[in-house]
UniProtKB/Swiss-Prot annotation:
Lineage: Eukaryota, Fungi, Dikarya, Ascomycota, Pezizomycotina
Gene that encodes it: cdc123
One GO term (biological process): eukaryotic translation initiation factor 2 complex assembly
Function: ATP-dependent protein-folding chaperone for the eIF2 complex. Binds to the gamma subunit of the eIF2 complex which allows the subunit to assemble with the alpha and beta subunits.
Protein name, as recorded: Translation initiation factor eIF2 assembly protein
Organism per entry: Aspergillus clavatus (strain ATCC 1007 / CBS 513.65 / DSM 816 / NCTC 3887 / NRRL 1 / QM 1276 / 107)
Biased composition (Low complexity): 7-17
Length: 421
């Protein structure tokens, strides 16, 4: 009996695991590399915001991976050994300058900031350190000094994922030889510095492409913007035309996700990012299960091809044309008009363009007005604090009460240990 129970439990766990696993096709290593900024940006340079790519050396990547945050001194001026001996303080415990091993990168960053007017936004190959903006004085990605950049990069879990887990849940490319197929490819890490532009978050959109078909799109910001509903058709046509002209046939993979920005007056479209067709990419207002099961024009055409073949038999009597049979049933004068109308409607449906779904947050959607919950809040505080805040004032009060009990108990233990000395 116990054996049967454990066996049924194992089957249930296996079934749950299969339900939770999304039906993604295998994600090859090459797809992740194709979505790296350094790979696609040179091809689409004219349609992307102004940016500079700085190749990163191994010492700099090691600096990003290292525990702790040690920043270079803000201003370093060369000094002679005599000066150092004269003004050195033997008692001072100064941190070593980490930029000594990557001075060239440090200099390139400073010159790029100056070139772009004193303000840039950083990202690594795939991710921007958006989860670390709480460390910034401006509470955004705006950086004015190299140290602003280093602080964001070293504080970001997103950047850590780029460094440590870029090929999670991926498979080797089938074109590679068996000898080297299991080895993960080397990643040429780059620091991307974009000229800082104060984007209107309401006009940033995420678009999903499957089999080189623009399947659906949605707004990126999790707030309701009433004016977007009046612009939906205009924005959709702009995005579709942009995709058809620039991305449909030029990106190496048939499945991918791209982000774009369409500033007023909604004539120019900017490509902001390209993301993997993978669970790691946030589907935002959709779910991945929903996207993976959507039908696109290719799928609809295949379904129509399986339908029974229909035909029309015609009788030619001089100049008169008589319909004798449509789809195997004889047509009459009374029925021919409705059939012709039906056929006309069907032709209209076939000729009508496929419109990708454009999802916006409505006024009464639960997601609306997400400014009450800060984005990436789980990266800022202990999870217990975040979870307690989501349950409302009661949950937070309960958490604070428990926290005070823990502190009081800790103080009592400290007092008792001191008295026992």
């Amino acid at each position: 009996m116990p054996h049967q129970e454990s066996e049924s439990q194992a089957q249930a766990e296996s079934s749950n695991e299969q339900l939770e696993r999304l039906p993604f096709p295998p994600i090859p290593y090459s797809h992740i590399l194709h979505c790296s900024y350094h790979h696609w940006q040179p091809r689409y340079r004219t349609i992307t915001p102004k940016s500079r790519l700085i190749p990163l050396t191994d010492p700099f990547v090691s600096y990003l991976r290292a525990d702790g945050i040690v920043l270079p001194p803000e201003n370093t001026s060369p000094q002679d050994e005599d000066d150092l001996d004269t003004f050195s303080d033997d008692g001072a415990d100064e941190e070593p300058d980490p930029s000594v091993e990557w001075q060239d990168i440090h200099s390139q960053i400073k010159s790029t900031i100056s070139e772009f007017g004193g303000k840039v936004t950083p990202k690594l190959n795939w991710s921007a350190p958006k989860d670390a903006v709480w460390m910034s004085a401006t509470n955004d990605l705006q950086c004015r000094t190299p140290n602003d950049i280093y602080l964001l990069l070293k504080s970001s879990d997103f950047v850590t994922h780029d460094l440590e887990h870029p090929f999670d849940d991926c498979v080797p490319d089938t074109t590679e030889t068996t000898e080297s197929s299991d080895a993960q490819p080397e990643i040429p890490y780059h620091l991307v510095l974009r000229k800082y532009v104060n984007f209107n978050p309401a006009l940033e959109f995420r678009c999903f492409v499957r089999n080189r078909v623009l399947l659906c799109m949605c707004q990126r910001d999790q707030n309701h913007f009433d004016f977007l509903f009046g612009l939906r058709d205009t924005l959709r046509s702009r995005i579709q035309a942009f995709f058809d002209e620039h991305l449909k046939d030029s990106f190496p993979d048939p499945n991918f996700v791209f982000d774009m920005y369409i500033p007023a007056p909604y004539q120019r479209v900017w490509l902001v990012d390209i993301n993997p067709w993978a669970p790691r990419t946030d589907p935002l207002l959709f779910s991945w299960l929903e996207i993976l099961h959507m039908r696109d024009p290719i799928g609809i055409q295949e379904a129509d091809d399986d339908a029974p073949e229909q035909f029309v038999r015609l009788s030619l009597n001089g100049d008169n044309l008589t319909i004798l049979d449509v789809g195997g049933n004889e047509g009459s004068d009374s029925g021919s008009e409705s059939e012709a109308e039906a056929e006309g409607d069907a032709e209209d449906d076939d000729d009508s363009p496929f419109l990708p779904e454009f999802r916006l947050i409505k006024r009464d959607d639960p997601e609306a007005y997400a400014f009450t919950t800060p984005q990436y809040s789980a990266h800022k505080l202990p999870r217990e604090v975040v979870d307690a805040s989501l349950t409302g004032p009661g949950g937070m009060s309960e958490f604070l009460g428990k926290w005070q009990e823990i502190l009081a108990k800790q103080e009592q233990e400290d007092t008792e240990s001191e008295d026992g000395r």
